[in-house]
């Protein structure tokens, strides 16, 4: 499980979270429920966060924003209340990243996602979409490969094997695939972005494929970007808009 420095950097956003915490299948989830509008209650967007987890206000506000757009959204706390703390974004912070990594590998955290999916199915949910950010993309892609989910969006994905994971996705998944990419991203660099276009583009992936590109943005922009930078603000807002449109089109 590898990371880049930008995985741990960013800006904490301001706002007042409107969602609520629920325990689903024994796992804490931050839930955004649409208010004042009709929405499908049997279709769920799984919000799969970066390393700062659902405790980070940025992630909570994004869940709320999806709900405001009529999408019932569950942010899964697959770090079991132990994400990397928000103050680890501060320069000079000495948080033990390596120690945290050892305790939160895929094999340890993926069962939490599966438990939430199983519990929601028992409640009558029939379709799932995912929006995965950085760390969360490494759940979104396998879920699509296993055809557990019906539509996928990822933003500045990390921990993917390129081209292997992309080729497998293209060959077996039925979930339309959106990638929000950016100019500076050590985890999904220009070479990986181009490879994705070769694998999925030009109609090769029948369910649907699109890759958005946001110049002037770095890895993490869609969650922790500095909104005082006009290009980063445009990137964050653009990635959110494209994700909402993609999820609404296919879920």
Question: PLM ranges: what are they?
Answer:
Residues 1-251:
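N-terminal cap/leader regions of alpha/beta-hydrolase-fold enzymes
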């Amino acid at each position: 499980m590898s990371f880049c420095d930008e995985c741990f950097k960013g800006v904490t956003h301001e706002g007042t979270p409107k969602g609520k915490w629920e325990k689903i299948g024994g796992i804490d989830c931050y839930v955004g429920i649409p208010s004042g509008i009709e929405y499908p209650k049997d279709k769920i967007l799984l919000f799969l966060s970066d390393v700062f987890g659902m405790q980070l206000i940025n992630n909570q506000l994004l869940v709320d924003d999806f709900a405001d757009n009529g999408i019932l959204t569950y942010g899964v706390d697959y770090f079991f209340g132990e994400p990397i703390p928000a103050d680890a974004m501060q320069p000079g912070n000495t948080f033990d990243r390596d120690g945290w990594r050892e305790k939160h590998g895929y094999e340890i955290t993926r069962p939490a996602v599966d438990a939430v999916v199983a519990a929601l199915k028992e409640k009558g949910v029939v379709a799932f979409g995912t929006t995965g950010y950085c760390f969360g993309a490494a759940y979104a892609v396998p879920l699509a490969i296993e055809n557990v989910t019906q539509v996928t969006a990822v933003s500045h994905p990390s921990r993917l094997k390129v081209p292997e994971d992309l080729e497998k996705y293209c060959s077996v998944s039925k979930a339309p695939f959106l990638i929000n990419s950016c100019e500076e991203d050590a985890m999904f660099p220009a070479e990986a972005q181009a490879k994705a276009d070769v694998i999925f583009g030009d109609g090769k992936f029948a369910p649907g494929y699109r890759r958005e590109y946001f110049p002037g943005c770095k890895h993490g922009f869609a969650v922790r970007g500095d909104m005082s930078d006009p290009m980063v603000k445009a990137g964050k807002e653009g990635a959110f808009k494209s994700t909402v449109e993609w999820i609404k089109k296919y879920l």
